[in-house]
A protein has these predicted regions:
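Walker B catalytic acidic pair
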Residues: 316-318
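Loop/turn-to-beta-strand initiation segments
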Residues: 112, 269, 309-311, 335-340, ...
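Conserved lysine of the Walker
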Residues: 35-36
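Nucleotide-state sensing region of NTPase/ATPase domains
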Residues: 47-130, 136-146, 203, 207-208, ...
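Long, charged N-terminal accessory/stalk domains
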Residues: 122-123, 129-178, 182-185
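C-terminal lobe/lid and adjacent interdomain/linker elements of RecA-like ASCE P-loop ATPase modules
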Residues: 79, 88-90, 325-366
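Conserved NTPase motor "head" modules and their coupling/switch loops across ABC/AAA+ ATPases, GTPases
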Residues: 1-31, 171-312, 321-325, 329-332, ...
Length: 366
């Protein structure tokens, strides 16, 4: 799949700008705070309808504008298609694909993206929330139902959290606590099945990439960790649901005392091992960066296997954070699909990839 052209109107620092991309590598250069990440953010939104930097659409609208528009011509599934995302703070968001109204979750049927930014280099060392976000973002693009379950789970989690925090002042809130707990158990069961399956594929895809990078000196292993009472995360949703309910029953009193949700998929994590040792605790910075690179490149391969097309790869100022060896490893692995690379200076990337160079200054693309 290819983003052929994108037009931005009132989006971030872009007043009105149109840019055409090459089908292969595109190097987007410019000094800091000129709009490089904003452009990648707009492309990312074509796959999911949301930003990777903020939860609030109003922050995407440029100063002095009442709304923002993203209009793109894309080539996917062997045909040209158009995507139009209209952001109107206070009025909601409107998404059109080929002129037909769609939900944000349906965008993934047209465009898929894999984003790699500097924060992802800390994927191994950071907290579990970062790794859950990786799972959520990836699975939502290839399994639309997952996004629905995730949205439902988050809604229930927020309601239950408020009950646990306020029940002492309003004891009547406890009348609905079990209902929300049961709903969370049901939604968790679905999320766990999807996450377990994707984690297994990620393990299989990332291991050979990491082995190749380390000259066969390191073995990467990814294990999915979920609610302790879940005996088999690959079992049916019903079986997993009963296992989670067991955990919920054991921790109900502890939840009331701590005012926290202790049971559910919000505690999930990916455990990363290098040569059998926990990478988060014992791996060097170089090892964890290699593992993070391997995982992100594996995500790209999974999308290819799932859809028959490479997703659009977005490298947001990440190559500057890597040494020459790791830069070369990434650049040698990104053939076959479209890639957008942002950087402060070209630094020979375009020559090494044969890519097109775009220069951004104060929201103007040249």
């Amino acid at each position: 799949m290819i983003i052929m052209k994108i037009a931005l109107n009132g989006f971030r620092n872009y007043e009105f700008e149109t840019v055409e991309f090459a089908p292969g590598t595109n190097v987007i250069s410019g000094q800091n705070a000129q709009g490089k990440t904003n452009l990648l953010e707009a492309v990312y939104m074509l796959s999911c309808g949301r930003s990777f930097r903020t939860r609030f659409d109003r922050e995407l609208v440029g100063f002095g504008y009442s709304g923002a528009d993203i209009l793109a011509d894309v080539y996917s599934h062997e045909r040209e298609q158009t995507i139009n995302i209209q952001l109107r703070p206070g009025q909601g968001k409107k998404i059109l694909v080929n002129g037909v109204k769609k939900t944000a979750g349906e965008l993934a049927d047209t465009v898929n993206t894999v984003l790699f930014c500097p924060d992802d280099l800390n994927l191994i060392k950071d907290g579990a929330a970062v790794r859950r976000r990786l799972l959520d973002n990836a699975i939502s693009q290839i399994r639309p139902r997952y996004a629905e379950y995730l949205s439902e789970f988050n809604r229930l989690y927020e309601h239950k959290t408020r009950i646990l925090k306020d029940w002492r002042d309003k004891p009547s809130l406890l009348e609905t606590l079990d209902e929300f707990s049961d709903g969370m158990c049901r939604a968790s069961a679905q999320l766990i099945r999807y996450r377990a399956a994707f984690s297994a594929r990620l393990d299989q895809a990332a291991a050979p990439i990491h082995k190749d990078f380390s000259n066969s000196l390191e073995e990467l292993e990814i294990k999915y960790k979920t609610v302790s009472t879940v005996k088999d995360p690959f079992a049916s949703a019903r079986e997993i649901y009963y296992d989670i309910c067991e955990h919920q029953e054991k921790h109900r009193q502890a939840e009331l005392e701590s005012a926290q949700c202790l049971t559910g998929a919000h505690k999930d994590d990916l455990e990363i091992f290098i040569n059998g040792t926990a990478a988060r605790s014992f791996a060097s910075q170089g090892q964890t960066r290699t593992a993070a690179l391997s995982i992100k490149l594996a995500e790209r391969e999974i999308f290819l296997a799932e859809t028959g097309e490479y997703p659009v790869l977005l490298l947001d100022d990440v190559l500057s954070e890597l040494d020459t060896k790791r830069q070369e490893f990434v650049l040698n692995r990104i053939g076959g699909g479209q890639t957008l690379i942002s950087c402060c200076e070209d630094e020979g990337i375009s020559k090494r990839t044969g890519g097109r160079v775009l220069f951004i200054s104060e929201g103007t693309i040249k």
